[in-house]
Amino acid sequence: LKCNKLVPIAYKTCPEGKNLCYKMFMMSDLTIPVKRGCIDVCPKNSLLVKYVCCNTDRCN
């Protein structure tokens, strides 16, 4: 699985066991992701942060 880094022109291949890509947004600004990468389990959203997860190459 390949996931985009913070700047989507760059990406990395995920290590074994991390089979989801994610992007994280601050709830105050849902237009600009503040973090992207590979993850094993999609975190729950909170009052401050929203996560969007997916499982295909460079989907984040």
Curated annotation (Swiss-Prot):
GO molecular-function term, one example from the UniProt record: toxin activity
Identify the tissues in which this protein is expressed.
Expressed by the venom gland.
Q: Does the keyword Secreted apply?
A: yes
- Output the InterPro entries linked to this UniProt entry: Cytotoxin_Cobra (IPR003572), Snake_3FTx (IPR003571), Snake_toxin-like_sf (IPR045860), Snake_toxin_con_site (IPR018354), Toxin_cobra-type (IPR054131)
Q: Could you tell me which cysteines form disulfide bridges?
A: 3-21, 14-38, 42-53, 54-59
Which Gene Ontology BP annotations are present? killing of cells of another organism
Respond yes or no to whether keyword rRNA-binding is given for this record: no
Localization in the cell: Secreted; Target cell membrane
Instruction: Cite the entry's keywords alphabetically.
Output: Cardiotoxin, Cytolysis, Disulfide bond, Membrane, Secreted, Target cell membrane, Target membrane, Toxin
This entry carries the following GO cellular component terms, namely: extracellular region; membrane; other organism cell membrane
Kindly give the Pfam families that the UniProt entry links to this protein: Toxin_cobra-type
The record's section on PROSITE patterns has: SNAKE_TOXIN (PS00272)
Give the top-rank taxon of the lineage listed in the UniProt record for this protein.
Answer: Eukaryota
Function, in words: This three-finger cytotoxin is a basic protein that interacts and penetrates into the cell membrane, with the tips of all the three loops. Cytotoxins which have a 'Pro-30' (P-type) interacts with membrane stronger that those which have a Ser-28 (S-type). CTI interacts with membrane weaker than CTII.
* UniProt family annotation: Belongs to the three-finger toxin family. Short-chain subfamily. Type IA cytotoxin sub-subfamily.
Quaternary data: Monomer in solution; Homodimer and oligomer in the presence of negatively charged lipids forming a pore with a size ranging between 20 and 30 Angstroms.
Protein name (Swiss-Prot/TrEMBL): Cytotoxin 1
Q: Which organism is it from?
A: Naja oxiana (Central Asian cobra)
